[in-house]
Every structure is written in structure tokens, then in C-alpha cells.
Amino acid sequence: MIITANEVINRLPIAKTFDVSKITPQIDSVIRQYLKPRLGLEFYEAINTDRISLGAGTPFAVYAPATAYTQGDTVIFNNVAFECIETPPAAGYNPTQVLYWQYYAPFTTAKYRDLWITGGLFDFVCNAVMIETIPFIHLNVQSAGLSVLSDNFGNAATTQDVERLLKTFAERTETAWNQVYNFLTLVNDNLNINNPVLYPLFAENC
């Protein structure tokens, strides 16, 4: 799969204790409705094939608190890949310590890592996932009917609150897509950039 629920949670300004089971089913929907139509099936498959699995058999070691990591090390922490960007002063500095770690785009090929982060594809996918997820965290869908979920530590969001949040994520999704599109079609002779040649499978570059 091109993204994990934990990556979405790590990227967006949402509770880090968010229930991943609410997000995971919506990733397939985003792939079908957002990614494949906009990227084109062949290009999407090329990106997805280049993706490094974060499950069993991943080339990255799982973060170990007792290990003394150094700059350049890559680990898996809560099913998200991180790269050590500065050697911590001692063992035990886990990837939540942003002075020493940053998110690592888990792709084999540099051009896809660049597209994922610099090109904005990561943000596009994350925000689209939330568009599909929010209705199912506001409403509890049961065979007996629908009910509004409540929070023991606050008030449940109103329909207007949900609509406003959905609008925000929709705007963020389209902003991210514009970034993706501009990146994939970018030509800059002064900087020796010709992304249509670098990403020939993108439908607009064919």
C-alpha cells in the first residue's frame, strides 16, 4: 500500500492517538478516487511498486531504545520510517525528538522520494484520506441506525463543524495537488530541471 495510517497521523495536525482502524479502510478509497484518476494507472503502479514495505521484511530496522543511532540511520517507529538527521547525545532519543529525526519517504528510487515530499504527493494523499475518514468518525454507522459519536472530554462536533473541517481538508487537498502537478510538469533550464522527462509516465507528460 502506498501509505500507512500511521503516516497520515504523523503528518497531519490530528491526535497522535487517533484510531488507525478508522483511517486504513479509507486509503483504498483514496487510491481509487484520487490517485489513480489524477496520476494515471501506469504512473500510480510505478510509484506504488517502488514503495518500500514497512511491514515484515522491511529493510529498515525497528527502532530500539537501547541502540545508539548516528546520523543517516533509518528506522521504523510506529509503522513510520524515520531518518536520523543528527547524532543524538545518547541512546533513547526516539523519532519523536525532532532535533534528531525526520520522516523518511520509504521509496527505493530518489525521484519518487522527491515527488513524495518536495512534490507534495504525501500531503495530497494525507489530506484526501481525511476527507474520506471524517464522516465515519463523526457518525457511528450501525445496523440499528446512525448515531453521532461523542467525546467524554468535550462536546461532539456539530454538522457545521464537520462541514467546515471537510472544506478545510478539501482545500488543502487541492492545494497539494496543484503542487504535485506543477512539480511533475516543471521545466527550468537555468536549474537543469526537466521533470516531464524524469516522470514520463504521468499522463500530462506522455
Model-derived regions: residue spans:
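Conserved short "hinge" loops at termini or chain/domain junctions
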Residues: 1-65, 70-73, 78, 87-122, ...
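Long, hydrophobic, well-ordered secondary-structure blocks that form the structural core
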Residues: 164-167
